[in-house]
Design a protein with these regions (language model features):
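Short microdomains enriched in Cys/His and/or Lys/Arg
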Residues: 38-48
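Conserved non-cysteine loop/helix-boundary elements of the Radical SAM core domain that shape
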Residues: 27-38, 61-160
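N-terminal pre-triad scaffold of radical SAM enzymes
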Residues: 1-28, 46-61, 65, 95-97, ...
Length: 160
């Protein structure tokens, strides 16, 4: 079964810090998020639907759950609409920070049928986290993992 991801980059949206290892302009090729998310997803789905059995929509490059809620829901609504139209879309995933996870945020993600939460942990050593200007602690990660594991999400931990 062939699988693909549609990567939607939201460069530095809601990132409170300038972490030493992150250069979203270089990664995404731009500092601006996609303005026409519906058009972008439709074009990507049309392009991929004949070549892949399963496709997921992946929001990367920022702290997705830290985006102002109306804006976050605008992105999630577009993903939900694409998922309804293109039956090969099997999941919606996003990356975020451990300190941007709460019961309320997880309720919102469940409402839009997000399947996977990727936490940018980077380290479980508080000295390393402070030196790299992450702005969260190892305990924040532990709390976020506990909250996510109570729900039906798949969980990915990212380390740099």
């Amino acid at each position: 079964m062939k699988h693909a991801s549609i990567s939607v980059f939201v460069p530095h949206l809601a990132c409170p810090n300038d972490c030493v290892f992150c250069n979203q302009k270089r990664i995404a090729g731009t500092e601006k998020p996609i303005a026409d998310i519906d058009g972008f997803l439709a074009a990507a789905c049309e392009d991929l639907s004949d070549r892949f059995d399963e496709v997921d929509i992946a929001f990367f490059g920022g702290s997705f759950t830290g985006i102002e809620e109306p804006e976050m829901c605008r992105y999630l609504s577009a993903a939900a609409r694409a998922r309804e139209k293109y039956k090969k879309i099997t999941g919606i995933r996003l990356s975020t920070r451990p300190d941007y996870i709460s019961e309320h945020i997880l309720d919102v993600l469940e409402e839009y049928r997000v399947t996977t939460v990727e936490l940018g942990v980077q380290s479980m050593n508080d000295a390393v986290l402070a030196a790299s200007r992450r702005g969260h602690t190892a305990r924040d990660t532990e709390k976020a993992v506990e909250l996510i594991k109570k729900r039906a999400f798949s969980l990915v931990l990212q380390f740099m």
